[in-house]
Amino acid sequence: MDRLTRILAALTRWGLGLCALVLVLMALYVSLGRELTPLVAEYRADIEDKASAALGMPLQIGELEGNWSGFAPILLARDVMVGSGANALRLDQVRAVPDLWASLLAREVRIAHLELNGLKISLKEAEDGTWALEGLPVQKDQPLDPEQLFNRSQMIQQLSVLESQVTLQPLDHPPMTLTYVGLNLKTGASRQRLDARLTLPDGQPLALSLRTRIRPSQLRDSTVEGYASLPQSDWSKWLPERLTQQWNFSEIKAGGELWVNWTEGTLQSAAIRLNAPQLTGAYAERKPIQINNLALNAYYENSARGATVTFDSLAMNVGETRWESRVQVQQTRATDKVEELWHLQADRLDLTPITPLLNALGPLPQGVATAVERLKVTGGLRNVLLDFRPNATDGTKFGFAANLDNVGFDAYHGAPAARNVSGSLSGNLDGGELRMDSKDFVLHLDPIFAKPWQYIQANARLTWKLDKDGFTLIAPYLKVLGEEGKIAGDFLIRLHFDHSQEDYMDLRVGLVDGDGRYTAKYLPEVLSPALDEWLRTAILKGAVDQGFFQYQGSLSKNAGEADRSISLFFKVHDAELAFQPGWPHVSKVSGDVFIEDSGVRILASKGQLLDTQVSNVFVNIPHVPAGQHTHMYLDGAFAGGLGDGLKILQDAPIGTGETFAGWEGAGDLNGKLKLDIPLAKGEQPKILVDFKTANARLKLAEP
């Protein structure tokens, strides 16, 4: 036990003595350092020579001093110039902290911390698009060796640049100066880190951070993790025209954050969070558009199969409309079994703001831009799927599918206009299909009909084909419910890319259990104005048992009569007709109405005019050449009272009112009537009446 005590006491004494010796040596080391470092100024010329030899270029030091801090000497040089000529590097101050222990082990100079102050460099763009660095000395005729540069950087453990300035000089654009540039670089054999901060010309700070794993012998396998913080600045005034090309931006106020991960020579992952309070710009000479409160969160992932870009949140204000969507783009790389595929999917796309966006910012050909502007697409898409195969040579190169939500578009180049189209859509470049299930559906077959057709419910199946000659739209099944009744139909529309060829349409529409008040909506624009006006005002009401409309021919407004064929048929009962202003209405009419290229024919089996029954009425309004007046020819039988006949003679606009004024009569009246009534105003009708009376009584006003 005593022996152990003595050993512990001896170890304690030796330990305390050793600590005291270390403290004495450290104090001596610090004291000698404090005494000797100021003498460094006397070796300024030697240091210049040594540094010039190491750098391979001249180095001049205006003032050199040394001091001590902690356990390390500090060398402070002012007014330092490296190199010569226009590219000489001038520094206000250089502060170096040598690593004495590492220098002794490596038997060459090692710097623990090198601090540069007042660095001023510039990047200038040449006419060929290359950038040249000015303000840094270079060794002529010596190409850049990355491995040699990396090995030299290992001499400095930490490099700091403070209070510096970088000037960017793009071609044909005012220079841009970045001030208060500060960076800190920590080097290592396998890991490096760079942190930088600078101030933009508007005074906003920008921050960068890079963490790398670089090995000079395996540069391709290097890893870079980067981060950037961008302030809310107006970037439009700093972007050169060569970068924006034909886009003209008057304001790009945006900021955000960016994360990247680069490995094995490619981008492995990235994330961006962007917030742009206001963007204003246009493509070429188009009208500018303003986008407010743009918010974007996007992610990028790379794998062996392909890449994925996810827009987790994409939203903006376009005018008074808030546009939001979530979009994902997936790339499948080509293999021996699978061709390259780009797949896009979106939960919802509001189409209404897209039209002004494409009109203002879309780099579209003039023809496509005109079509987008004329169509004015509205509504939305849900569950959008797009497939793009870059190497495909057939129609499968581009495929799509989506659910339509109240989509609408205007008529353009013979294609019909529609509103509130809902259903499912799928297809590719060769063709596709639309299955429609819509409420409050609107269809406008322009230019055949002046006004659109409105329906309560519509169900249809439409297919289309696209070839090198034109576009074909086919509706083999169309069923709608409107205020006029139940309607079914089909149509075919062919639009040619060559405008010298005639676009045409085949349309058939059938109506059952209809209302005669709405039959005027199916009157085509090609009818003469007088006939069109008569048909729209003559049928006041009635029940349509059956109706049929057919159009075959050209879609051009300037097409001739021989280029189209029109037929319209209605089978009605309990109808009321006002066939001419001033004449009493004919009610309880049952018969058929034919509207054809040759004219209009009405075959009424029965009806009632006042209290007189009419039967076997035939109305004919033949088609006349342009410039001639349209006439209505009426032939029919009647059976009623003499009083009704006198009332017609007194009130009808046939020029007999004064003659039969004041006449009164009673009794039975039967006969036949023929009328020739011009539909143009200002002409007198012609009347031929063959009648007989029975048990009649007639009272004349002036016998």
Which ranges hold each PLM region?
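Elongated, acidic membrane-bridging lipid-handling scaffolds
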Residues: R44, L116-L119, P137-T244, E251-K253, ...
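Terminal hydrophobic membrane-targeting helix
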Residues: M26-D128, L206-S209, R213-D221, E251, ...
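Secondary-structure transition motifs
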Residues: D2-R6, M57-P58, I74, R78-T187, ...
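Solvent-exposed loop/turn tips at the surfaces of repeat/solenoid architectures
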Residues: L64, V80, V94, L114, ...
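Outer-membrane beta-barrel proteins
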Residues: P98-L104, W262-E264, R333, F388-A392, ...
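Extracellular/lumenal and peripheral-membrane lipid-interaction modules
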Residues: R3, L8, T12-L18, V22-L64, ...
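Amphipathic hydrophobic-ligand
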Residues: P58-G62, G85-P98, I111, D172-L183, ...
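Strand-loop-strand
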Residues: L198, A295-L314, L434-I448, P452-V480, ...
